[in-house]
Amino acid sequence: SFVNPRKVPQMADAEAVLQALGAPPSGVHFIGLVLNHRGFERAVAAGCNEIGMAVVASDSFNRRNQGGSTDESIAAWLDLAGKAEQAGIRAQVTVSTAFGCPFEGEITVERVVEVARRVAEARPFEIALADTIGAGVPTQVTEIVSRVREAVPGIPLRCHFHNTRNTGFANAFAALHAGVRTLDASLGGIGGCPFAPGATGNIATEDLLYQ
């Protein structure tokens, strides 16, 4: 994550991690999470061959997480996606709080679809739908994935779940049945957004593979 090291100090050594890994093997993508131009420049200089940006469906959360409105983040994404294309690297985007927000509560399906349509204007390699705080349930996953697939045909969807309420793996199963073919997970279920009160880790890679 190439985010502000003063706000997220545990990510301050992103360049050192990439340096230790060396060049990515053929077919492997080192993805750098960026939120602005500075992060993009750092990620490219460090050797990332794919960048990902987050745009939050909840304006309140976007302001706390990224210091600006959702509209501002969408504008930044469209610009950075163009720069990534010029640099010859892939770009993908995550629609965060797609299943609920700790500050605004429920996020309507219409809002998620609206944000997905707007970020799709840059023709990203992939759009992710993130349950940032682990609030989603399988029926909600089915509805949101189906609606977004209809709204942005031709763009692959990825889903990102947390297991806050022990629904993360059921949500992953629902996403697969709804047509998603890529899921985020982390070893041991580590992770969690520092700006999301009460957030727990991602679904665990080893448990997802077992499922």
Predicted region positions:
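Short amphipathic alpha-helices and their capping/turn segments at secondary-structure boundaries
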Residues: H37-G47, A76-Q86, R117, A172-A175
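Catalytic alpha/beta core domains of metabolic enzymes, predominantly
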Residues: T132-Q211
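Non-cysteine beta-strand/loop elements that form the S-adenosyl-L-methionine
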Residues: N49-S58, Q92-S96, G179-L187
